[in-house]
UniProtKB/Swiss-Prot annotation:
The gene is rpl2-B. It is found in: Plastid, Chloroplast. Keywords: Chloroplast, Plastid, Ribonucleoprotein, Ribosomal protein. This is Large ribosomal subunit protein uL2cy. GO terms for cellular component: chloroplast; mitochondrial large ribosomal subunit. One of its GO terms (biological process) is mitochondrial translation. Residues 1-27, 224-273 are annotated as: Disordered. It comes from Liriodendron tulipifera (Tuliptree).
Length: 273
């Protein structure tokens, strides 16, 4: 990832650091429009996810998370920007004429060849079942349910590690630090997701943040009591509670939000950090 630092000419470019290498040129048969959702609101119009709204219109790129083009090699033709995720995507031309988008593996360049199947080489970008991978393999785009497509380790720079195989299950260490069991028949892609330096980017101004659909973040302590439990008081007053809370009065900062008695509790050997 090439980070471009602006030459300071205006206040908005003083602290900007953006990626100037990857562009977007989507294929018409691999994109479709998407409805602009309710800006963080639910069906009743109540805010359930804060600081969302506005943003530029986006076209959704159809990503091949299943990698079910078995035993057919494909060639990386382009590496493109995707506005719907922080990872890059690359266009694959398969030998049978099929064209698909996949997540860009770290280190992959235009012209590289990838393949998916049961007996394929353990090389970057190849997709195969966990049972055919050696221990210690770095993987991403991991299936939870067989045939459903990859659901884990899909963000930019994400990578998981295969640490054990026993019986019908494989043990993985996920990017969050969680250690859990997954069926050995599930597939994954070898390597790490690209765009590792995404956290080095600095938009430099509020307007660029708004283009991404992210609204300003306001502290609860400066609100009125009707808007937040921390609000109110004369001047710079404390929050008036023993512990911080969310805008809806639930404990914040450390409260576990995972639902109890989920079916996957028995599959998690060590919870996330």
């Amino acid at each position: 990832m090439a980070i471009h630092l602006y030459k300071t000419s205006t206040p908005s470019t003083r602290n900007g650091a953006v990626d100037s290498q990857v562009k977007s040129n989507p294929r018409n048969n691999l994109i479709h429009g998407q409805h602009h959702c309710g800006k963080g609101r639910n069906a009743r119009g109540i805010i359930t996810a804060g600081h969302r709204g506005g943003g530029h219109k986006r076209l959704y790129r159809k990503i091949d998370f299943r990698r079910n083009e078995k035993d057919t090699s494909g060639r990386i033709v382009t590496i493109e920007y995707d506005p719907n995720r922080n990872a890059y995507i690359c266009l694959i031309h398969y030998g049978d004429g099929e064209k698909r988008y996949i997540l860009h593996p770290r280190g992959a360049i235009i012209g590289d060849t990838i393949v998916s199947g049961t007996e394929v080489p353990i090389s970057m970008g190849n997709a195969l079942p966990l049972t055919d991978m050696p221990l210690g393999t770095a993987i991403h785009n991991i299936e939870i349910t067989l045939g459903k497509g990859g659901q884990l380790a899909r963000a930019a720079g994400a990578v998981a590690k295969l640490i054990a195989k026993e019986g019908k299950s494989a043990t993985l260490r996920l990017p969050s630090g969680e250690v859990r069991l997954i069926s050995k028949n599930c597939s994954a892609t070898v390597g790490q997701v690209g765009n590792v330096g995404v956290n080095q980017k600095s938009l430099g101004r509020a307007g660029s943040k708004c283009w991404l659909g992210k609204r300003p973040v306001v502290r609860g302590v400066v609100m009125n009591p009707v808007d937040h439990p921390h609000g109110g008081g004369e001047g710079r007053a404390p929050i008036g509670r023993k512990k911080p809370t969310t805008p809806w009065g639930y404990p914040a900062l450390g409260r576990r939000s995972r639902k109890r008695n989920k079916y996957s509790d028995s599959l998690i050997l060590r919870r996330r950090k």
